[in-house]
């Protein structure tokens, strides 16, 4: 199916039928260059495999009606599908994946939804180079394992309890080389174990990483933290996670002083990241809404002076950004000195002659 516009489908929720602009239950179908709007679900792939969805645009009715409409693209009990180069906005969830394994979702743009991408009971999926902007939550991985999230962007996901990525009740997932910026929380982990968080950039978020005590045995390595209000918060009792792998920790920006006398870009001693904001978040969820307040910086500073902050992270092998080699300033004068010397010698010879 190619080059079609589909609109004005039923939005009735009282029927057992989940209405959608397109619903497929066959094998090896292709949906290319489609525009879908004013329907319940945009595209519903149900119990069918090997489907290609490419360059499909789905538009819902807006954030004010998220609860009364369906998802942009929905995959249920299906596998080996590709969703790529598509744009979804103003639906309930952008892409919803349930009991669906071995799918590839790449190069899509999702905005103004509840969750941009929502995995439930889905394993062995690949999630690559997607962009999630201005959603309540960028992506949600729930009750799933062995998912690879690589080179995605999560930005401006703001609101009450918002996040770029949530990993909940999930295990053995890899979050690699993604960017999290200007989110309320970059990554939020709850009741999850043995996930690998590597090479990601967290900058200008309210909270870079939020870890609840029910999340343990995560591995964090080669991540960059820069100018977040709180780089890491651990909520509840102490959780046991690993902040380095094979002698490679994380980059902590300018907040933590790291000494590197041997110039190998690895700190000579462990560093601790401390914060007192966990107290506010534990006591009252409304605290998330005030993290940008100037009073928060004062609160942190007071607790730092009083030594009442709690250790959030101990990084045994903190990393240091490699400085760009610059030309020594003295070298800039060598050409000028050579020219001046040549002029001086020439004038001296002319006088002698």
Question: What are these model-predicted stretches?
Answer:
Residues 1-2, 7-29, 41-48, 75:
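Extracellular beta-strand-rich solenoid/capping regions of secreted or surface-exposed proteins
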Residues 2-8, 28-38, 49-62, 79-92, ...:
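Right-handed parallel beta-helix
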Residues 14-23, 38-41, 65-76, 90-96, ...:
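Extracellular beta-strand/beta-solenoid scaffold signature
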Residues 16-18, 25, 47, 69, ...:
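Exposed loop/turn and edge beta-strand positions of beta-sandwich/beta-sheet ligand-binding modules
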Residues 25, 31-34, 43-61, 105-113, ...:
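Well-ordered, non-transmembrane segments within structured domains
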Residues 160-163, 204, 208-212, 217-353:
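Functionally critical loop-and-helix segments that line ligand-binding/catalytic clefts
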Residues 187-190, 198-211:
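Eukaryotic non-globular interaction segments with acidic/serine-rich, low-complexity composition
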């Amino acid at each position: 199916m190619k080059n079609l516009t589909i609109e004005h489908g039923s939005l009735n929720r009282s029927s057992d039928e989940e209405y959608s602009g397109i619903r497929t239950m066959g094998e090896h179908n292709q949906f290319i260059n489609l525009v879908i709007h004013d329907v319940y679900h945009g595209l519903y792939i149900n119990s069918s495999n090997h489907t290609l969805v490419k360059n499909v645009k789905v538009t819902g009715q807006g954030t004010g009606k998220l609860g009364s409409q369906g998802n942009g693209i929905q995959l249920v009990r299906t596998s080996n599908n590709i969703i790529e180069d598509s744009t979804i906005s103003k639906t309930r969830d952008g892409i919803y994946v349930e009991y669906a394994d071995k799918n590839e979702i790449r190069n899509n743009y999702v905005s103004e939804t509840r969750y941009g991408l929502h995995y439930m009971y889905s394993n062995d999926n690949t999630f690559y180079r997607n962009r999630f902007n201005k959603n309540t939550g960028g992506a949600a991985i729930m009750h799933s394992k062995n998912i690879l999230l690589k080179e995605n962007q999560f930005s401006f996901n703001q609101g009450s309890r918002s996040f770029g990525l949530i990993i909940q009740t999930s295990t053995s997932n890899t979050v690699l080389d993604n960017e999290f910026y200007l989110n309320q929380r970059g990554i939020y982990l709850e009741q999850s174990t043995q996930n690998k968080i590597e090479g990601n950039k967290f900058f200008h978020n309210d909270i870079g990483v939020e870890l609840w005590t029910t999340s343990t045995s995560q591995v964090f390595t080669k991540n960059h933290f820069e100018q977040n209000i709180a780089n890491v918060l651990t909520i509840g009792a102490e959780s046991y996670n690993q902040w380095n792998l094979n002698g490679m920790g994380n980059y902590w920006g300018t907040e933590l002083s790291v000494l590197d006398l041997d110039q190998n870009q690895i700190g000579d001693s462990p560093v601790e990241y401390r914060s007192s904001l966990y107290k506010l978040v534990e006591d009252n969820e409304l605290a998330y809404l005030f993290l940008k307040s100037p009073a928060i910086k004062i609160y942190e500073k007071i607790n730092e002076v009083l030594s009442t902050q709690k250790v959030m992270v101990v990084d045994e092998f903190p990393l240091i950004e490699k400085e760009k080699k610059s030309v020594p300033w003295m070298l800039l004068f060598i050409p000028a000195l050579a020219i001046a010397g040549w002029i001086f010698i020439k004038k001296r010879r002319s006088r002698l002659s």
